[in-house]
Amino acid sequence: MLASALRLRRRAKTRARERGIALVMVLGAIAVLTVMLAEFQDETSAEAASATAERDSVQAEYMAKSAVNLSRLLIATEPTIRGAIAPLFLMMKKTPPQLPVWEFSDRILGAFNDEEGSKDFSVTVGVDAKTGKNLGIKDGRFELVIVDEDAKINANLGAANDIAHIRLAQELMGLMAPPQYNTIFEQKDGTGQFHDRLSVCSAIIDWGDQDEQLFNCDLTKLTGASSSGVEDAFYQLLPKAYRRKNAPFDSLDELHMVRGVNEDFWATFVDPDPTNPKKRPLTVWGTGRVNVNTANPQTLLGVVCAGAPQADICIDATQSQTFLMGVTMARGLTMGAPLFGSPNDFIQTMTGKGQLGPVLAAFGMKPVAFKSESEFGKSISTESKVFSVYAVGVKKSGIKRETRVSVHAVVDFQRTPSLAQANPFAALAAAAGTPSAAASAPPPNTENLQANATSAALNAAFPQMPVTAGHIIYYRVE
């Protein structure tokens, strides 16, 4: 009996030890699985967040791209809108000016935006956007600003011919001439050197021209191809050496590389307000002729001083401020409507004549005597052809999360037919074997085209169709 009891006792102890080992194994397995599941959850959550961010980024980018394309369409419709009001100007024996429809792009294109944009569109146009189909954006929006690049001084004139070099030198010196900017050129740069107006002007032109000759921006000597020896080795002597490009600027940021373009110069003459690109006096795109109807007051002052460097508004700070104030007030009264119908109207105004000349004189501004009114007239215009479109696509995800993608596109409307002139079916009709009727016939039936032309011929014809929405010459996504 005793032996049997001992055996039972030993067997119970063995079972107890075995149960303890099993418990440890189960707890260990649970711990390992917990770690694995936690890591798997973290990895899955990260991948899901990454996929969501990528999805939102793509959607935001396409919202911005849509805004760019809508802007191109809006600008392309301006000649048609201008034609509608042409009879009114003909009655007054005047040519209808270009209408700055791009200044109201956020309201006109609001029907394609979010609910808030649709409300702005309805208030502006008087039409309820909700009556349209497939309009508007859900869970997102786009923010849009269209900037007239022909309203600015084009630094890329330095990459053109000698006449363009002289014009750019005059405009740069005119822009920098007012005495309120003296302190900018009295400070040392990061290398301990001074850069006066002449050296900065020469550096900008020499960066873009194709020769190795130092351009002279002295206005008293600007009568031809002005050079004063060979370009120096300033850039090669910098701690991080590089060479002059001797080619056109590709972007505004490239101006940072030019001698004398420090932060003070940049904040005054290149990009005074990073949140408002319309205030930029300088550009690297454009036709080269400044639109006096859309140029900001600072740019207008520089352009006038280019043609009349000895005018009071160019050498007297009080007169400069009077001019800037007068232009700002006139723009405010017209609410964006063009002030001048032609370059000659602007010249007449600045010389104290015309309808606006006496108004500026009433403010105390003295008349301007241009060195050559005919030459000055060649540097200005009242019509713009090159525009920057700054579009931001905003994708909303959840309550607080927003994904933003910015697109900056520069669109050139030079040599672009208007919507009324273009016949998008001419190339297709030619491919169908009816080129003689392409210009005057109504839009051909697509089925007939398919029957009369091969698929290869049609594919070859599509690239030849006229582009009425301008040509994109610069494109950047951020």
Listing of model-derived features with the role each one plays in the protein:
Residues 2-478:
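Compositionally biased linear targeting/interaction segments
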